[in-house]
């Protein structure tokens, strides 16, 4: 398990773009489970949407990528590196995410060739899938 202090030592992301609060399970270099506590204090809720706050789908995908990045960057050979999106495939949004929700995010590495990889990611709220897809990444 990693708390936010440990996550900050692994990921290069910082406020307001750090979108993972805790890693609750990890198999370094292979898979991870993390949590994002969604609060009304998130800066994006000011404009998305006033009176009807909904977490932007692209930020759910980014949160999924950050959980996956913790798993990959925990691997000794990738420590200190920066992960970049190389592509996003088969992403589907099933439900909206609102303030007060807790995103449970699961990511698992599908393939890794050198510094290019693909992971399957799923985000849940209260046991229901809100988003799923495949994330392609490059590590530099």
From Swiss-Prot:
**Keyword Lyase recorded:** yes
**Which InterPro entries does the record associate with it?**
FabA_FabZ (IPR013114), FabZ (IPR010084), HotDog_dom_sf (IPR029069)
Pfam families listed in its UniProt record = FabA (PF07977)
What does the record give as EC number?
4.2.1.59
GO annotations of cellular component type: cytoplasm; membrane
Which residue windows are coiled coil? none
The name on file for this protein is 3-hydroxyacyl-[acyl-carrier-protein] dehydratase FabZ
Question: What is the source species?
Answer: Caldicellulosiruptor saccharolyticus (strain ATCC 43494 / DSM 8903 / Tp8T 6331)
This protein's encoding gene: fabZ
């Amino acid at each position: 398990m990693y708390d936010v202090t440990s996550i900050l030592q692994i990921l290069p992301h910082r406020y307001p773009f750090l979108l993972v609060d805790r890693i609750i399970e990890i198999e370094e270099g292979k898979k991870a489970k993390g949590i994002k506590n969604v609060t009304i204090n998130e800066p994006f809720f000011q404009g998305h949407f006033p009176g009807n706050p909904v977490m932007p789908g692209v930020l759910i995908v980014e949160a999924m990528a950050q959980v996956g990045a913790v798993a990959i960057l925990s691997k000794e050979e990738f420590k200190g590196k920066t992960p970049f999106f190389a592509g996003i495939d088969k992403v589907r949004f099933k439900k909206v995410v609102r303030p007060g929700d807790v995103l449970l995010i699961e990511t698992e590495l599908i393939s890794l060739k050198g510094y290019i990889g693909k992971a399957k990611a799923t985000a849940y709220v209260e046991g229901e899938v809100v988003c799923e897809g495949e994330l392609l990444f490059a590590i530099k």
